[in-house]
């Protein structure tokens, strides 16, 4: 009996403490915070984020409580933005207040203590590395000059699919390998020798680094930090990545130049590292972090978008007929497609826009509000974690007719760009933190897709119908397909 009473006292005491801590944290918040669901002591709204993808679950919350809603993730007060106006205010009107990134365990470990560009804090280091990226590495001019790499690798892929005509092929695997080779030749100056290892490292690390860690959500708990086993797995993954990148960097130092003697990304970064005029020194970790950015954001996302576009076209035969017809009419008699020609393919570019709307490369854009701000009439406290639900905004029925339907023709009536000016469609973000590799990524999507539609008719394997195509998304930063896309290539325009 005494033991039972003791346990009751302990449980009541713990619950009382947790409730008091919640009330203390709530008392520190401004009065006019965004609305949110009822929360539980200590864990807040974590129980509402089980059993689905975060962007889907958070959309359900904002549909019920409004496009600007707060969620309490453990100890962390967070705000979800799921409307074009809220995104516009955060990314344009109040951009300096929302240009920072919050750093969690996954990004700190896998992105080299935020010395990269994607997860870097908004500071002099970020400004410097972004300037290098935009002016020296991934400018539109440089992207065009690298067209021969895309042509080489796509020619190899086309030949591979020609050799498999009439047979089911794993399109997901082959496109991922091709995009990886394109990116590695740009980054390293040559193709990666152990490409499958690199692809597996990138995909596995992205999976492990996505999602919520309890140690992140309860930063005051040393015990949860100690017991965060995924943290140790991430460090082991980081060690494997270090070993891989160190080997390539050392090999690159020996070669001292990229293909045909020109500068590649590593050459430029090494040159900048030696520049005594740099405001913030570029470290070896900074170089590795940038290279990891290029692969994680450039390989997985570009390949995923091509595959989503092919998946959607296969589900809608009338769209599949229209897209190749435009490409073939425009490029009649040619054996390859370059970036200049792709820019003239209006319907193909609408197909890419629509794939990016329904399946954005980064479904959730993380930001950090660095000073108290007002968004759509609500007060956002300083140091609030912001989650901009790009996936939800792209499916908002207020701005999109039949929002869940793949319809590239919609852009004939209301043309929208994807470079951050139209906040109904922001797959690459907007404002200061817009993706610096935007032009590089689009080139690696549009050119391969045009080639695939120009040379082949794509059919489903025997016994499958459009309704059988699995469109399930997988957990991850880039929202990829859960299962591989299997299609049958039928040659339409042979390469020889």
UniProtKB/Swiss-Prot annotation:
GO terms for biological process: defense response to insect; response to insect; terpenoid biosynthetic process. It is a single-pass type II membrane protein. The chain crosses the membrane at residues 1-21. Its EC number is 1.14.14.-. It comes from the Eukaryota. Pathway: Secondary metabolite biosynthesis; terpenoid biosynthesis. It is an enzyme of class 1 (oxidoreductase). Induction: Accumulates upon root colonization by Myrmica ants (Myrmica sabuleti and Myrmica scabrinodis) concomitantly with jasmonates induction; this leads to the production of carvacrol, an attractant for the phytophagous-predaceous butterfly Maculinea arion, whose larvae initially feed on Origanum vulgare flowerheads before switching to parasitize Myrmica ant colonies for their main period of growth. Slightly repressed by Spodoptera littoralis, an herbivory insect. This is Cytochrome P450 71D179. It comes from Origanum vulgare.
């Amino acid at each position: 009996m005494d033991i039972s009473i003791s346990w009751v006292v302990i449980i009541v005491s713990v619950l009382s403490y947790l409730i008091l801590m919640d009330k203390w944290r709530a008392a520190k918040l401004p009065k006019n915070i965004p609305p949110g669901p009822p929360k539980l002591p200590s864990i807040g709204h974590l129980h509402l984020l089980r059993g689905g993808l975060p962007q889907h679950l958070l959309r359900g919350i904002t549909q019920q409580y409004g496009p600007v809603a707060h969620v309490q993730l453990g100890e962390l007060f967070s705000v979800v933005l799921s409307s074009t106006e809220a995104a516009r205010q955060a990314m344009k009107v109040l951009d300096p207040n929302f240009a920072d990134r919050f750093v969690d365990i996954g990004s700190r470990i896998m992105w080299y203590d935020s010395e990269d560009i994607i997860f870097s804090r908004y500071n002099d280091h970020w400004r410097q590395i972004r300037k290098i990226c935009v002016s020296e590495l991934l400018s539109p001019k440089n992207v065009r000059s690298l067209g021969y790499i895309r042509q080489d690798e796509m020619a190899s892929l086309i030949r591979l699919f020609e050799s498999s005509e009439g047979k089911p092929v794993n399109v997901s695997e082959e496109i991922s390998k091709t995009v990886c080779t394109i990116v590695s030749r740009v980054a390293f100056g040559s193709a990666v020798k152990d490409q499958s290892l690199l692809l597996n490292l990138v995909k596995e690390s992205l999976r492990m680094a996505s999602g919520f860690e309890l140690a992140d959500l309860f930063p005051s708990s040393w015990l949860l930090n100690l017991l965060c086993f995924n943290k140790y797995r991430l460090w082991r993954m980081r060690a494997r990545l270090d070993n891989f990148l160190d080997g390539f960097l050392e090999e690159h130092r020996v070669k001292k130049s990229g293909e045909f003697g020109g500068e590649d990304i590593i050459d430029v970064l090494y040159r900048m590292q030696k520049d005594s005029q740099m405001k913030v020194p570029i470290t070896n970790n900074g170089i590795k972090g940038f290279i990891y950015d290029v692969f994680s954001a450039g390989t997985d996302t570009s390949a995923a978008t091509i595959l989503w576009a092919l998946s959607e076209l296969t589900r809608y035969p009338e769209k599949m007929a229209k897209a190749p017809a435009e490409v073939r009419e425009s490029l009649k008699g040619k054996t390859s497609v370059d970036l200049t020609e792709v820019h003239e393919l209006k319907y193909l570019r609408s197909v890419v826009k629509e794939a990016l709307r329904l399946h954005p490369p980064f479904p959730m854009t993380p930001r950090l509000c660095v000073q108290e701000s007002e968004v759509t009439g609500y007060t956002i406290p300083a140091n609030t974690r912001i989650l901009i639900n790009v996936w939800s905004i792209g499916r908002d029925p207020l701005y999109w007719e039949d929002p869940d339907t793949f319809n590239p023709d919609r852009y004939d009536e209301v043309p929208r760009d994807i470079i951050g000016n139209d906040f109904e469609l922001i797959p690459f973000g907007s404002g200061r933190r817009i993706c610096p590799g935007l032009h590089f990524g689009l080139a690696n999507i549009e050119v391969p897709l045009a080639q695939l539609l120009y040379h082949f008719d794509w059919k489903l394997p025997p016994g499958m119908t459009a309704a059988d195509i699995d469109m399930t998304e997988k957990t991850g930063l880039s929202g990829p397909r859960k299962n591989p896309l299997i299609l049958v290539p039928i040659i339409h325009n042979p390469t020889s």
